[in-house]
Amino acid sequence: LTELETIQQQKSFKVLLIGESCTDEYHYGVCERICAEAPVPVFDYLEKEIRAGMASNVRENLISFGVDVEFITNESNLLIKRRFVDTKSNQLLLREDITHPLTPIEIDKLIDCDAIVISDYSKGLLSEQVIDFICTFFPGPIFIDSKNSNLKIFKNAIVKINSDEEKKMISHPINSELIVTLGKSGAKWRDKFFASPKVDVFDVTGAGDIFLATLCYFYLSTQSLDVAISKAVYLASKSVQHMGVYKLTHEDIMEVM
Protein backbone atom coordinates (compact mmCIF):
# COMPACT_ATOMS: atom_id res chain seq x y z
CA LEU A 1 0.00 0.00 0.00
CA THR A 2 1.10 3.55 -0.63
CA GLU A 3 1.30 6.00 2.28
CA LEU A 4 -1.90 7.66 1.04
CA GLU A 5 -3.81 4.36 0.88
CA THR A 6 -2.57 3.36 4.33
CA ILE A 7 -3.73 6.64 5.89
CA GLN A 8 -7.06 6.52 4.07
CA GLN A 9 -7.74 3.05 5.48
CA GLN A 10 -7.18 4.15 9.06
CA LYS A 11 -10.09 5.07 11.32
CA SER A 12 -11.06 8.70 11.52
CA PHE A 13 -9.66 10.36 14.62
CA LYS A 14 -11.54 12.16 17.36
CA VAL A 15 -9.79 15.14 18.94
CA LEU A 16 -10.73 17.40 21.84
CA LEU A 17 -9.65 20.95 20.97
CA ILE A 18 -9.52 23.57 23.72
CA GLY A 19 -8.50 27.19 23.22
CA GLU A 20 -9.37 30.82 22.66
CA SER A 21 -11.10 31.87 19.46
CA CYS A 22 -11.44 35.26 17.83
CA THR A 23 -13.17 36.94 14.95
CA ASP A 24 -10.69 38.06 12.30
CA GLU A 25 -12.00 41.06 10.36
CA TYR A 26 -10.24 42.17 7.19
CA HIS A 27 -11.11 45.64 5.91
CA TYR A 28 -9.80 46.11 2.38
CA GLY A 29 -9.32 49.44 0.65
CA VAL A 30 -6.85 51.65 -1.20
CA CYS A 31 -4.63 54.51 -0.07
CA GLU A 32 -4.00 56.99 -2.88
CA ARG A 33 -3.91 60.34 -1.06
CA ILE A 34 -2.70 61.97 2.13
CA CYS A 35 -5.03 63.42 4.74
CA ALA A 36 -5.20 67.25 4.81
CA GLU A 37 -5.38 67.36 8.63
CA ALA A 38 -2.32 65.21 9.30
CA PRO A 39 0.43 63.46 7.29
CA VAL A 40 -1.33 60.08 7.23
CA PRO A 41 -2.84 58.12 4.32
CA VAL A 42 -6.58 58.22 3.67
CA PHE A 43 -8.11 54.73 3.55
CA ASP A 44 -10.82 54.47 0.87
CA TYR A 45 -12.93 51.53 2.01
CA LEU A 46 -13.81 48.75 -0.47
CA GLU A 47 -15.00 45.65 1.37
CA LYS A 48 -14.93 43.61 4.57
CA GLU A 49 -14.22 39.92 5.09
CA ILE A 50 -14.82 38.00 8.32
CA ARG A 51 -13.06 34.74 9.24
CA ALA A 52 -12.75 32.55 12.32
CA GLY A 53 -9.32 32.87 13.92
CA MET A 54 -7.04 31.46 16.61
CA ALA A 55 -8.33 28.10 17.94
CA SER A 56 -11.23 28.21 15.47
CA ASN A 57 -8.66 28.17 12.67
CA VAL A 58 -7.05 25.08 14.22
CA ARG A 59 -10.50 23.48 14.22
CA GLU A 60 -11.12 24.29 10.56
CA ASN A 61 -7.82 22.71 9.56
CA LEU A 62 -8.33 19.59 11.69
CA ILE A 63 -11.67 19.19 9.91
CA SER A 64 -9.82 19.49 6.58
CA PHE A 65 -8.04 16.26 7.54
CA GLY A 66 -11.35 14.55 8.31
CA VAL A 67 -10.86 14.73 12.07
CA ASP A 68 -13.95 14.66 14.32
CA VAL A 69 -13.43 17.71 16.55
CA GLU A 70 -15.01 18.32 19.95
CA PHE A 71 -14.42 22.03 20.59
CA ILE A 72 -14.33 23.99 23.85
CA THR A 73 -13.84 27.73 23.33
CA ASN A 74 -15.17 31.20 24.11
CA GLU A 75 -17.70 33.25 22.18
CA SER A 76 -15.68 34.60 19.27
CA ASN A 77 -17.13 38.12 19.56
CA LEU A 78 -15.27 38.54 22.87
CA LEU A 79 -11.99 38.76 20.93
CA ILE A 80 -11.87 40.69 17.66
CA LYS A 81 -8.82 41.39 15.50
CA ARG A 82 -9.62 44.10 12.97
CA ARG A 83 -7.10 44.58 10.16
CA PHE A 84 -6.98 47.31 7.52
CA VAL A 85 -5.22 46.28 4.31
CA ASP A 86 -4.19 48.34 1.27
CA THR A 87 -5.13 46.15 -1.70
CA LYS A 88 -2.69 47.87 -4.06
CA SER A 89 0.39 47.02 -2.03
CA ASN A 90 -1.05 44.14 0.06
CA GLN A 91 0.28 46.14 3.00
CA LEU A 92 -1.27 45.80 6.45
CA LEU A 93 -1.82 49.39 7.59
CA LEU A 94 -3.34 48.96 11.02
CA ARG A 95 -4.56 46.26 13.39
CA GLU A 96 -7.12 47.04 16.07
CA ASP A 97 -7.63 44.47 18.85
CA ILE A 98 -10.87 44.43 20.83
CA THR A 99 -10.53 42.25 23.91
CA HIS A 100 -13.08 41.39 26.59
CA PRO A 101 -12.32 39.33 29.72
CA LEU A 102 -12.83 35.60 29.24
CA THR A 103 -14.36 33.32 31.85
CA PRO A 104 -11.99 30.43 32.64
CA ILE A 105 -13.41 27.04 31.70
CA GLU A 106 -13.87 24.24 34.21
CA ILE A 107 -13.11 20.62 33.31
CA ASP A 108 -13.50 17.75 35.75
CA LYS A 109 -13.76 14.86 33.30
CA LEU A 110 -12.34 14.09 29.86
CA ILE A 111 -14.15 12.66 26.86
CA ASP A 112 -12.96 9.53 25.10
CA CYS A 113 -10.78 10.77 22.23
CA ASP A 114 -7.54 10.03 20.39
CA ALA A 115 -5.77 13.27 21.32
CA ILE A 116 -6.21 16.62 23.01
CA VAL A 117 -5.08 19.83 21.30
CA ILE A 118 -4.63 22.98 23.38
CA SER A 119 -4.38 26.32 21.57
CA ASP A 120 -3.43 28.61 24.45
CA TYR A 121 -3.24 32.31 23.58
CA SER A 122 -3.02 33.25 27.28
CA LYS A 123 -6.24 35.26 27.12
CA GLY A 124 -7.69 33.76 30.30
CA LEU A 125 -9.71 30.77 29.07
CA LEU A 126 -7.30 28.12 30.35
CA SER A 127 -6.27 28.07 34.01
CA GLU A 128 -3.17 26.27 35.27
CA GLN A 129 -5.48 23.94 37.20
CA VAL A 130 -7.29 22.83 34.04
CA ILE A 131 -4.01 22.39 32.16
CA ASP A 132 -2.58 20.34 35.03
CA PHE A 133 -5.71 18.16 35.14
CA ILE A 134 -5.49 17.43 31.42
CA CYS A 135 -1.75 16.74 31.44
CA THR A 136 -2.06 14.48 34.49
CA PHE A 137 -5.08 12.37 33.60
CA PHE A 138 -5.33 12.17 29.80
CA PRO A 139 -3.56 8.97 28.68
CA GLY A 140 -3.13 9.86 25.00
CA PRO A 141 -1.03 12.44 23.13
CA ILE A 142 -1.50 16.09 24.09
CA PHE A 143 -0.49 18.80 21.60
CA ILE A 144 0.02 22.29 22.99
CA ASP A 145 0.66 25.63 21.29
CA SER A 146 1.06 28.26 24.00
CA LYS A 147 1.96 31.92 24.43
CA ASN A 148 2.79 31.23 28.09
CA SER A 149 6.49 31.75 28.89
CA ASN A 150 6.26 29.47 31.95
CA LEU A 151 6.22 26.16 30.11
CA LYS A 152 6.75 24.01 33.19
CA ILE A 153 2.97 24.05 33.70
CA PHE A 154 2.85 21.65 30.74
CA LYS A 155 3.90 18.03 31.23
CA ASN A 156 3.70 14.75 29.30
CA ALA A 157 2.93 16.68 26.11
CA ILE A 158 4.14 17.72 22.68
CA VAL A 159 4.65 21.47 23.01
CA LYS A 160 5.07 23.83 20.07
CA ILE A 161 6.28 27.44 20.35
CA ASN A 162 7.84 29.89 17.90
CA SER A 163 11.33 31.38 18.00
CA ASP A 164 10.16 34.66 19.61
CA GLU A 165 8.40 32.70 22.34
CA GLU A 166 11.53 30.60 22.85
CA LYS A 167 13.50 33.77 23.67
CA LYS A 168 10.93 34.71 26.34
CA MET A 169 10.71 31.19 27.78
CA ILE A 170 11.49 31.08 31.51
CA SER A 171 11.03 27.33 32.05
CA HIS A 172 10.89 24.12 30.04
CA PRO A 173 7.90 21.76 29.81
CA ILE A 174 8.24 18.65 31.98
CA ASN A 175 8.71 15.21 30.42
CA SER A 176 7.65 16.68 27.08
CA GLU A 177 8.82 17.16 23.51
CA LEU A 178 9.51 20.81 22.58
CA ILE A 179 9.20 21.91 18.95
CA VAL A 180 10.25 25.43 17.95
CA THR A 181 9.01 26.89 14.67
CA LEU A 182 11.45 29.22 12.93
CA GLY A 183 9.24 31.18 10.55
CA LYS A 184 10.30 30.88 6.92
CA SER A 185 13.32 28.78 7.97
CA GLY A 186 11.23 25.82 9.17
CA ALA A 187 11.33 24.20 12.61
CA LYS A 188 13.64 22.46 15.06
CA TRP A 189 13.12 19.55 17.44
CA ARG A 190 15.85 18.13 19.65
CA ASP A 191 18.96 18.26 17.44
CA LYS A 192 17.03 18.07 14.16
CA PHE A 193 16.25 20.88 11.73
CA PHE A 194 13.29 20.77 9.33
CA ALA A 195 13.65 23.17 6.40
CA SER A 196 10.64 24.95 4.94
CA PRO A 197 10.07 25.25 1.17
CA LYS A 198 11.09 28.61 -0.26
CA VAL A 199 7.87 30.54 -0.93
CA ASP A 200 6.76 34.16 -1.19
CA VAL A 201 5.53 35.20 2.25
CA PHE A 202 2.46 37.49 2.22
CA ASP A 203 1.06 36.98 5.71
CA VAL A 204 2.12 34.71 8.60
CA THR A 205 -1.30 34.93 10.30
CA GLY A 206 -2.57 31.45 11.17
CA ALA A 207 0.49 29.53 9.98
CA GLY A 208 1.04 28.22 13.51
CA ASP A 209 -2.56 26.99 13.61
CA ILE A 210 -2.01 24.93 10.46
CA PHE A 211 1.27 23.63 11.87
CA LEU A 212 -0.51 22.48 15.04
CA ALA A 213 -3.41 20.79 13.21
CA THR A 214 -1.07 19.03 10.77
CA LEU A 215 1.27 17.95 13.56
CA CYS A 216 -1.61 16.34 15.44
CA TYR A 217 -3.09 14.55 12.43
CA PHE A 218 0.13 13.06 11.11
CA TYR A 219 1.37 12.03 14.54
CA LEU A 220 -1.88 10.13 15.09
CA SER A 221 -1.58 8.63 11.60
CA THR A 222 2.07 7.60 11.71
CA GLN A 223 3.13 7.69 15.40
CA SER A 224 6.26 9.48 14.13
CA LEU A 225 7.08 12.98 15.34
CA ASP A 226 9.72 13.23 12.60
CA VAL A 227 7.13 12.66 9.89
CA ALA A 228 4.53 14.88 11.57
CA ILE A 229 6.91 17.85 11.88
CA SER A 230 8.03 17.53 8.25
CA LYS A 231 4.42 17.56 7.03
CA ALA A 232 3.53 20.44 9.37
CA VAL A 233 6.42 22.59 8.12
CA TYR A 234 5.43 21.97 4.51
CA LEU A 235 1.73 22.75 4.93
CA ALA A 236 2.37 25.82 7.11
CA SER A 237 4.23 27.23 4.09
CA LYS A 238 0.92 27.09 2.18
CA SER A 239 -0.69 29.43 4.69
CA VAL A 240 1.87 32.24 4.45
CA GLN A 241 1.25 32.60 0.71
CA HIS A 242 -2.26 33.93 1.42
CA MET A 243 -3.57 37.01 3.17
CA GLY A 244 -5.22 36.16 6.48
CA VAL A 245 -6.03 32.84 8.10
CA TYR A 246 -6.06 29.97 5.63
CA LYS A 247 -7.91 26.66 5.52
CA LEU A 248 -6.02 23.82 3.86
CA THR A 249 -7.60 22.49 0.66
CA HIS A 250 -7.88 18.87 -0.44
CA GLU A 251 -5.19 19.61 -3.04
CA ASP A 252 -2.84 20.99 -0.35
CA ILE A 253 -3.23 17.86 1.75
CA MET A 254 -2.78 15.48 -1.18
CA GLU A 255 0.67 16.99 -1.77
CA VAL A 256 1.96 15.48 1.48
CA MET A 257 0.18 12.13 1.35
Segments and roles (model prediction):
Residues L16, E70-I72, L94, F143, ...:
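Hydrophobic/aromatic beta-strand patches that form the interior of the parallel beta-sheet core
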Residues E32-A38, K81-T99, A115-H172, S185-G186:
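Conserved beta-alpha-beta core of the PfkB/ribokinase-like small-molecule kinase fold
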